[in-house]
Amino acid sequence: QAVAFPAGLIGIDDKDTRLGKAVVNLLKHDDECNAHYPYPQIAARMGEGDVALKYIWNGVNVHQMYPQGLMHNVTGYPDNIYDLASVHNLLKDTYMIRSHDFFQCGMEPMSNYCTGINEMMLQSNEGKIRVFPAVPAAWDSIPMAFILLARGAFLVSASRNNSAEVTQVGVKSLKGNLCRLQNPWGDKKCEVLRCRDGRKVSVKTGGDGVLAFSTQTGEEYVVRLIGTETLVKEVYFGKPNICLLYTSPSPRDTERS
């Protein structure tokens, strides 16, 4: 599975190949066996948005047992937890740590889940940029947008409405490289405009539906369907986290228990 992520040797275009089918098939094991493993990213790289979301939820709800990222020590707990001489043997005796009842998963949860979501929104590992390549069906009625970096030194933004339709794509060129974008509207004709003056940019469309256009360093471009208007900037707001007040039991309540 590493051939899809992190190696990036195959992707959505290889989904129907023998190797691609093998990777997709390996994602079908027991839902609760992924632990903190990059299954969300692997699933997204193969265009399996529903599977990616499933493993993200599973990692948070099942494997990561506590809000701060702690999980139970499943290597001998609770048999050896009270043995002061007990150690956890890692990397074949090259890394020994004292046994604890809890383990901190470190950066794994955050990096896995955040990177997984990023890969669901944007991919650029196949020599081209894809926007919304692996959005799960559960999000089809949710408007969404992102701004992420893509390979080739491009800052890419894109928005999608509540009908699961891409409304427009924005590209800021940081190094003036050739931009190759998978047409997010399939075989529909689209155009590229330079934001500074609204001038149309020459675009070449390949047989694989990839739009290729030259860029200049620091310039911003909008990719849109022909006949549609460029959308104005939209600010998205989220609801603040709900604060819950927990009170400790009184000494009297403790005595009763």
Positions of predicted regions on the chain:
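Catalytic cores of secreted or luminal carbohydrate-active enzymes
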Residues: 107-155
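Short, well-ordered beta-strand segments enriched in hydrophobic/aromatic residues
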Residues: 156, 166-173
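Surface-exposed beta-strand/loop patches in extracellular or lumenal glycoproteins
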Residues: 172-186
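C-terminal beta-strand-rich structural cap/linker in extracellular carbohydrate-active enzymes
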Residues: 206-242
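Conserved small/polar residues in nucleotide/adenosyl-binding loops
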Residues: 246-253
